Amino acid sequence: MSELKRTILYQAHLDAGATMVDFGGWDMPIQYPEGIIAEHLYCRRHCGIFDVSHMGRIDVEGPDQVAFLQHVLSSNVLALDLNQAQYCIIPDANGYAIDDAYLYRFEEGKYFLVINAGNIDKDWAHLMNEAKNFDVKLTNVSDKYAAIAVQGPESKKILMTLSGGRQLTPENVKNALNS
């Protein structure tokens, strides 16, 4: 058996008393001493921060990036404005789901696709095979960056505090849920 990969936050998880498990080949926390119900409720009522560094991350660039993404994803890429994300499916040629993913558009001319940790190799092979028919550049940056997800009703307030009051999200977000 191969050794499990560890995120940059591995030691912080241990220091916080996390119970670690094999998750798609990564040594990831499944719960902390307070228990999963308390963690769930805290996130729903306040804010939770999740280490998602194990997820696959792919930069998509090039003249045919939109056509490529329209071809390999189930969602309408053209509906995505700057600083937005959308949930999508990566279907095979018959329309069956290979994986689900999130597509981000952080800047003009560049998209960022986040895929599941356990499917990185399979998804990468599929996307690279499909990319042969497009003028597009795919870069697997999964090992280049750590990543966290900040979720819950107090997320915006906490992010603004951490950023010194800098606005990190657009004021009006399409499809946003407000509490």
What are these regions (language model features)?
Residues 1-179:
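Basic, glycine/lysine-rich polyanion-binding surfaces/domains
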